[in-house]
A protein has these predicted regions:
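Active-site flanking residues adjacent to catalytic metal/cofactor-binding acidic residues
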Residues: 4, 32-33, 63-64, 144, ...
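Acidic, His/Gly-enriched loop-helix segments that form or flank divalent-metal centers
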Residues: 23, 92-201, 205-210, 217-233
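Short, glycine/charged-enriched secondary-structure capping and boundary segments
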Residues: 15-19, 44-47, 75-78, 157-158, ...
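Active-site environment of divalent metal-dependent phosphoester hydrolases
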Residues: 7-11, 37-40, 66-71, 150-151, ...
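Active-site neighborhood of divalent metal-dependent phosphoester bond hydrolases
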Residues: 38-133, 171
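Hydrophobic N-terminal alpha-helices or hydrophobic patches in metabolic proteins across all domains
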Residues: 18, 231-236
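Residue-level recognition of the N-termini of beta-strands and the immediately preceding loop/turn
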Residues: 27-28, 59-60, 178
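N-terminal active-site segment of His-dependent metallophosphoesterases
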Residues: 1-48
């Protein structure tokens, strides 16, 4: 079962997992990153995957560029007194929604205080976020958040491409021996996913009026996709 770019949409994700009868003991869940930002309930999403992996070691959670930005913003807030570059970059990508899911009183102005607090209050979660892998190789597919450089082997990629890449990956017709599942670049028109010869993009842009996708690959290797519009309780409203 594969999901990506949940962006704080916890209740939407939960609804889809229930609809496909996700069984954490028997099924393998692979999340392709971007669990945070934009939607309202990042805290619940992160904690869900953190606890899932703590209890069952066979589930896979990858680093998305939004987790990457969060990690860099926290590091900057803690270790440099003057620098704001990383925090600004993160807040331009709706980092405030994530901070507020942990600390509702957080604002752009007092964010440094709350980034520091997060590192103290949620040590285990922070360590987990820092150590998320950037890729995974399954029996039949490769998995990344954003993309790859096809001129290099799957295990010879650089961090930035795996987590941030759009082009030339998206236009490329080159392929590996296995198809790649990825998210990162929202598919904002029907069917809200994109299946190509070399890759499958499952970011349905649920926080942009699209849909959240959940992909089920059964034992025979058949692919089914369930979808949901974002539920109201996941929509972030500016306070």
């Amino acid at each position: 079962i594969i999901i990506s770019d949940i962006h704080g949409s916890f209740y939407t994700m939960k609804k889809l997992l229930d609809e496909v009868n996700f069984n954490p003991e028997l099924d393998k869940l692979i999340c392709l990153g971007d669990m945070c930002d934009r939607g309202k309930n990042t805290k619940f999403v992160w904690e869900y995957f953190y606890n899932l992996q703590k209890k069952y070691s066979h589930h896979i959670v990858l680093l998305g560029n939004h987790e990457d930005m969060f990690n860099l913003a926290i590091k900057e807030a803690r270790y440099t007194e003057q620098e704001e570059v990383r925090q600004d970059h993160y807040f331009r990508n709706s980092g405030l929604t994530t901070l507020q899911s942990f600390y509702p009183e957080a604002t752009k102005e007092n964010r440094r205080k709350y980034f520091k607090l997060f590192a103290q209050d949620f040590k285990a979660l922070r360590t987990w976020l820092k150590n998320l892998p950037t890729r995974y190789e399954g029996k039949d597919y490769y998995f990344v958040h954003a993309g790859v450089d096809f001129s290099k082997g799957f295990w010879n990629q650089i961090h930035r491409d795996l987590v941030w890449m759009r082009e030339p990956y998206l236009s490329s017709t080159e392929k590996y021996n296995k198809k790649i599942f990825h998210g990162h670049t929202p598919v904002l028109k029907e069917p809200y996913y994109d299946i190509r010869d070399n890759r499958i993009n499952i970011d349905g842009g649920c926080v942009y009026g699209g849909k959240l996708n959940i992909v089920i690959i059964n034992d025979e290797g058949e692919i089914n996709i369930k979808q949901s519009k974002i539920l109201e309780e996941d929509i972030y409203e500016d306070k």
